């Protein structure tokens, strides 16, 4: 998938569900899908046909990719690795997506949305085990320590993020120290700890054809 540069709210409308790409705004009546719950484009309102079979599987894959800002080749690699591993393929796929550094930064409450977390990582504001990592897709491991770098802690943006994420619930597989902008990975995420509106079995069926 090429990097998406258009308004991300159009992606939610395209998928017909909230992808939670803009943080707190997604939980308000300002969310685009609350105002225009139909596909973007001139004929968006007319696209009401029920999607079944392959189309349903494809849409589930696209939706999941977009939620995590994963590119097509990355997503396929995640699936192939999950399929070769020991465990339930769909759950292991989601586990790899959750272990992306940009997602972990978001889950820890260091960003109000995955898109913002991705930018923080790319701009060099995040360290893993004391070393700067600027690759959003970097896979964290158990016992890894993730932190906002010392030189970045004075950013005005972090004060805004702290206020916006003050009620964020951190999943059980992560430990966070909000005051010092650091956290760690205590375990690999279980399926019941991944609160995402995803039917991973549809994705498994798609790639297994």
UniProtKB/Swiss-Prot annotation:
Belongs to the universal ribosomal protein uS4 family. This is Small ribosomal subunit protein uS4. One of the primary rRNA binding proteins, it binds directly to 16S rRNA where it nucleates assembly of the body of the 30S subunit. With S5 and S12 plays an important role in translational accuracy. GO terms for biological process: ribosomal small subunit biogenesis; translation. SMART domains: Ribosomal_S4, S4. One of its GO terms (cellular component) is small ribosomal subunit. Residues 99-160 form the S4 RNA-binding domain. Gene3D superfamilies: Ribosomal Protein S4 Delta 41, Chain A, domain 1 (1.10.1050.10), RNA-binding S4 domain (3.10.290.10). It comes from Koribacter versatilis (strain Ellin345). It comes from the Bacteria. Keywords: Ribonucleoprotein, Ribosomal protein, RNA-binding, rRNA-binding. Part of the 30S ribosomal subunit. Contacts protein S5. The interaction surface between S4 and S5 is involved in control of translational fidelity. GO terms for molecular function: rRNA binding; structural constituent of ribosome. Disulfide bonds: none annotated.
